Amino acid sequence: MTMTRRTVLALLAAPVPAAAQASAWPNPLVSQRADPQILRHGEWYYLMATVPEYDRLELRRARSIAGLATAEPQVVWRKHDSGPMSRHIWAPELAFLDGRWFVHFSAGEAREPWKIRLWVLENASPDPMQGEWTERGQLKTQWESFTLDATVFEHRGRRYMAWAQTDPAKKNHSTDIFISRMKSPTELEGPQLRLSQPDYAWEKVRHIVNEAPAVLVHGGRVFMSYSAAGTGAEYCLGLLWADVNADLMDAKSWRKSPGPVFVSSPENSQYGPGHNSFLVEADGSVLNVFHARNYRDIVGDPLKDNGRATRVQPLAFTADGMPDFGPPLKEGP
């Protein structure tokens, strides 16, 4: 068969299946790393995630996503022996703000392991693999209560933080999603607005949880994914969205998906996909960075199971511009 130039160009322009795109890097990308975030800055990709020991913060860097799989992790900070920041070191996120590097993370105390709050590290070096990481203290919210999973983003010239927190007025110990403008990388401007709480049955399996917000601005909308339910196979993603020109600090600007948008796939042996982040490539394509296990059944507390692994796959969009997460892809090279 003779192929014309037009035919060749059409083939080159045709969408590449998600599984084919994902083959550019291993799946999983990194074993035993939960709550992953990949940040592209300059010519580098940076990866941070929760380590299974919950005792330190690691940073990896590579020229490609695939390179992160074999990049040597550098420990940038270790937990304290006692007091604040001495237990449950979770969900670090790297950000380059106002010409400096910051890590926002969650941590508890050795004597009160569930006294989890938000904390900040800062590094003035232009290279986050160099310089000194300095503790900048607690990033305080409206309440002194269980608080975790901060993510910082900028939109229309304003900086925001979204996070998960327990409202002390609630008796069910649920965690909800909140948002606030930021005065600086270490301080909220206030007030804080509740964007989502566990309303649906799928958000209340094993635990009553909305947590781990992640933000993507795409196609005229601001999307915020979040994770729901317990941390086993029931773990999944929900989705909030607002118009790109809306007031993000007005609850009426936001809509919420009535069902989960990213769930376990027994067919692909992927369970509990969640705590994601979004990575926008230079060409505008979007990747979903998340963790999942390759088995369903867990003995004991899922938080003590080390099987969550970092995974990356392309994110598609429907004809009307909504994210189409698809299923978590089967493991492969």
How should these model regions be labeled?
Residues 2-3, 9-12, 19-333:
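Carbohydrate-active catalytic/glycan-binding domains of CAZyme proteins
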